[in-house]
A protein has these predicted regions:
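Small-residue (G/A/S/T)-rich helix-start motifs and N-terminal tracts that mark the onset
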Residues: 1-65, 154-156, 163-304, 308-318, ...
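Nucleotide and nucleotide-moiety/phosphate-recognizing core
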Residues: 18-106, 114-134, 299
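Polar low-complexity intrinsically disordered regions enriched in Ser/Thr and small residues
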Residues: 76, 84-85, 148, 180, ...
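Short gly/ser/thr-rich secondary-structure transition/capping motifs
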Residues: 81-89, 138-142, 201-206, 301-307
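Internal gly/pro-rich beta-alpha loop/helix module
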Residues: 100-101, 106-193
């Protein structure tokens, strides 16, 4: 990228920010805008964007929350007819009953998490007014997505160049609201966290060649279910029997095997496999299930009850805990995992020398080298009994089909979330219905136009 004139990046950012604010408001003319301005470049972005909005007919007031403000941006705002003050009580009288939008330019990506009391007071004063955050909501931990104190909760975050971890990782992702990315034309460093897009998934999904047969497409085995939880076996098999592998084998209690075969007549019994799925509904048999699967020397998806029996490094495996299960494995409180899931999943992947898929609002997949992918597909209705069993089976099928554990876990999670969106249609869903929608999601993803970024 050619060297840009001084201030060009800020002008690009401000232009994108102003356009996003105007779009949110349905136009700028006659609208009332308050800028909350800190001392850094985020404050400068807000001031320059405010100047652009003022020139388009908005009434713009800036509340300066630091002794210093971006001088050129402040001068531009005033030249365009905007006002600036350091006193909340001195804001424009026309703001009664309140502004149409508040622009959060308090702290940028280099700031420390948390907010000062004057910023908290300003946010409280404008409670209920839509908030647009500049780059990231002020006060969140940009690098980990954790929250360490007061922070902005935005309706819209306008970010520049690339998304940040805080936009994608809970709990900070919930504070970001809708995301709008402004391309600054930058040469970006390698990403520390990835969110797969449809073209990425399409490039990774296994496709049978013209000479394929059921064995070359992979055989996945499922060891799941017990007298207490027979349905877990049916759901794990449903996920595995999505068509992504050539064959599914079920090994378990004969009474459950009869139900599996009645529901899924394609499923066969014991034999050689390329991957195992172990643990869903396994109960007291989970330890034996895991040991026998590990003895085969093939990749294993370790879920649910089997997670309690992981007592050392398990290279080649994929662990699929939710926050409570991971907390028990790490011997910490669940709240600690939920407060910083990114650090927790990376710690787990290093500790057990394998891929770890941490299920949640935004599911995270980490490998022992520190790579992380986040899944942004799915709907809140996916928080339902049995959904994790389907996911375990789906990941197992992808492993059997030949994907590396990191790719199998992240692609499986993406497809699972997309299938849930289809199954939901805006309303409740069941885990069984998610499994039914997987082939359609795969078919539509493979057929969609666009480049294969990872292929």
């Amino acid at each position: 990228m050619a060297e840009l004139p001084d201030g060009a990046l800020m002008q690009r950012a401000a232009a994108g920010l102003a356009a996003a604010v105007a779009d949110l408001l349905g136009g700028a003319y006659g609208r009332r805008v308050v800028l909350l301005v800190g001392p850094g470049d985020n404050g400068g972005d807000a001031l320059w964007a405010g100047a652009r909005l003022a020139r388009r007919g908005a009434r713009v007031d800036a509340l300066l929350l630091a002794e210093q403000a971006h001088e050129a941006g402040l001068a531009a705002l005033r030249a365009a007819g905007g006002r600036a003050t350091r006193d909340l009580a001195d804001l424009h009288p026309d703001l009664h009953p309140g502004p149409d939008v508040v622009v959060d330019g308090i702290i940028g990506i280099g700031g420390r998490p948390g907010l000062r009391p004057d910023a908290v007071a300003a946010l409280d004063h404008f409670a209920g007014v839509p908030v647009v955050a500049v780059d990231v909501p002020s006060g969140v931990d940009v690098d980990t997505g954790s929250l360490h104190g007061p922070h902005v909760t935005a309706d819209l975050t306008v970010t520049f160049g690339t998304h940040k971890a805080a936009h994608l990782v809970d709990p900070a992702s919930r504070a970001s609201g809708a995301l709008h990315l402004v391309d600054l034309g930058l040469d970006l460093p390698p990403a520390t966290i990835e969110a797969l897009q449809p073209h990425d998934v399409r490039a990774l999904l296994p496709r049978p060649g013209s000479d394929a047969h059921k064995y070359t497409r992979g055989v996945v085995g499922v060891r799941a279910g017990s007298g207490t939880y027979p349905g877990a076996a049916l759901l794990a098999v449903a996920g595995a029997n999505s068509g992504l592998a050539g064959m599914v084998r079920y090994v378990g209690p004969e009474a459950i095997a009869d139900r599996v075969r009645a529901t899924h007549p394609e499923v066969v019994g014991a034999g050689r496999v390329q991957a195992w799925v172990v643990g869903p509904g396994g109960g007291d048999d989970a330890a034996r299930m895991l040991a026998e699967a590990r003895d085969d020397g093939v990749p294993v998806v370790v879920d649910a009850d089997a997670l309690r029996h992981v007592d050392g490094p398990v290279p080649g495996c994929v662990l699929t805990p939710h926050a409570g299960e991971l907390a028990a494995m790490l011997d910490v409180e669940r709240t600690e995992v939920e407060a910083c899931p990114l650090d927790s999943v990376r710690d787990a992947a290093r500790r057990w020398d394998c891929v770890v898929l941490l299920k949640g609002h935004h599911t995270l997949v980490a490998d022992p080298d520190g790579r992380v992918r986040v899944t942004t597909t799915g709907v809140p209705w996916l928080a339902t009994a049995g959904a994790g069993d389907v996911l375990a089976g789906l990941v197992g099928a992808l492993l059997a089909a030949g994907l590396e554990p990191y790719d199998a876990a992240s692609v499986g999670s993406w497809v699972h979330g997309a299938a849930a969106t289809e199954a939901s249609g805006g309303g409740p869903l069941t885990a069984s219905r998610v499994a039914v929608e997987v082939p359609r999601v795969v078919r539509e993803t493979l057929a969609a136009p666009g480049p294969g970024a990872l292929g």
